[in-house]
Amino acid sequence: RPDILAAISKGEHSSTFGGNPISCAAGIAALTSITEDGLIENSKKMGEMFRQGLEKLKDKHTMIRDIRGKGLMIGIEMKFEVKDILMGLIQEGVLMLYSGRNILRILPPLVIKEEDVTKVLHALDIVITKEEEKRDV
């Protein structure tokens, strides 16, 4: 509409994501790193490692209701609120977020290593075990 178009003059509005040389170079460097450093393959491999480990934890712990996600984007649905689990994970050196009151959210960097996945799975096992003992489940 002409009245909206007339509200600003040329040059008054710009975009952070505009095609300037610096942002284009940064975008190219990021895409190059993703492809040349094998980040997609690592995401798939580490996601599968997480999934297998989490399924084992689900078999062991009745507090875990469901595991879902794709690649490294994973949700762990619990039968109870996750606040105490999050605090316990911090004590174990793992920072994790939640989605809703009862879902732990795992969204690590694409460069995550096997030892990091192992550490997270171990910490989850410890913290969930303590929480089950506390709740007597």
How would you describe each model-predicted region?
Residues 1-137:
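Conserved N-terminal phosphate-binding loop of PLP-dependent enzymes in the Aspartate aminotransferase
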